[in-house]
């Protein structure tokens, strides 16, 4: 267990009692052991009909995925259906925040992390450990390093303002952070690759977490083989470089994510404005209740009905505030978190584009070196060389002026170019295989993200709807009880 891999995991022997988690299931990818361990020449084992975390009966073959804009093919050969995403067989709960070393300068908040799972990689079906916020940060940072092709869920921000004001131990801030960490844990638990990571395994059940962290730091996954691309990337690849032949699948993925973010941002803006208006309305009802209480003191004959009416107004004001805190605020927090998750997915697609750009630029560089080598060979044999660029022409003229443009110099340059061409050919082959492997993994990651997005949107909208219905039902019941009392009021004119 020196690296964050899954060599000891039996993918095809899941217990039959485990509920299946349906998701796309192409043949096992090298990315399941981290991108560093990609071996393009290694054979891929066949996938079973159904194993833990996947449902192959609903997925198409990996070879069916083509360069097409068809959504079915782009998502790995099947339509994504959130109703089949059944990830409850691994449940992680972040709860019971507690202050540690209270009163000292080293005080921090720890959270109880309870895990229930039937995964065979866990020693116990139920474990409870305590982790602090920095432990979650450590987990995400190292998952990103070990699985660069995976969409690792974002971690909540540190909220610097609360650190400056000293409010990071307030109950409101701690609860808000706990909910954010709960979303992070849920996404990790439902991800069919990340939840099998050895680091996640240690995080969720190790009682010696500090030892496990140091062990993981001291035994990182093996680095990828050094290649020419590392030394040349800074030379000809920069922030302004663009992929010459964009893959239609990933172009549409990016556009789809951007449309989703734009739509969700609009919804978030509208709901946020509604929240502000509800706050204003609650304050108005509170002021009106005070006015009716004052009127009740003036009208001695109907003091009790007016006071009861004022109390119901206060109750309704409290009900509106309660709805904002328990329904609208969680919906806004959930939508903001989902926007961050989508942005993380887009960053992974950008990284895939960078892999393709590396391949394209290396190929172009190899072509230029081969052309120059052929030109020198033609000159050495006495034939007329092909037309050259301005830079090559100026260099040849300078060589002539220095007297270095002779047959021996050309042969030495050709010998060096032969070695560089061989090195570039190996680098181009590796870059091509890496780009293809990364692309296949991103296709699967997009399908996982679609399932997670649909599940989270369903839960958020369900909670939002239930909260609205509960508030309206409670308001109707309260007003129905007070209306008969108001109807019995008789005022002498």
UniProtKB/Swiss-Prot annotation:
This is Sorting nexin-4. It is a peripheral membrane protein. It is found in: Cytoplasm, Cytosol; Preautophagosomal structure membrane; Endosome membrane. CDD domains: BAR_Atg24p, PX_Atg24p. InterPro entries: AH/BAR_dom_sf, PX_dom, PX_dom_sf. Belongs to the sorting nexin family. The keyword Transport applies. A 1,2-diacyl-sn-glycero-3-phospho-(1D-myo-inositol-3-phosphate) binds at residues 132, 158, 177. Residues 1-67 are annotated as: Disordered. The gene is SNX4. One of its GO terms (cellular component) is cytosol. One of its GO terms (biological process) is reticulophagy. Keywords: Autophagy, Cytoplasm, Endosome, Lipid-binding, Membrane, Protein transport, Transport. Residues 37-48 have a biased composition (Low complexity). Residues 89-211 form the PX domain. It comes from the Eukaryota. Sorting nexin, involved in the separation or division of vacuoles throughout the entire life cycle of the cells. Involved in retrieval of late-Golgi SNAREs from post-Golgi endosomes to the trans-Golgi network, for cytoplasm to vacuole transport (Cvt), and autophagy of large cargos including mitophagy, pexophagy and glycophagy. GO terms for molecular function: phosphatidylinositol binding. The PX domain binds phosphatidylinositol 3-phosphate which is necessary for peripheral membrane localization to the perivacuolar punctate structures.
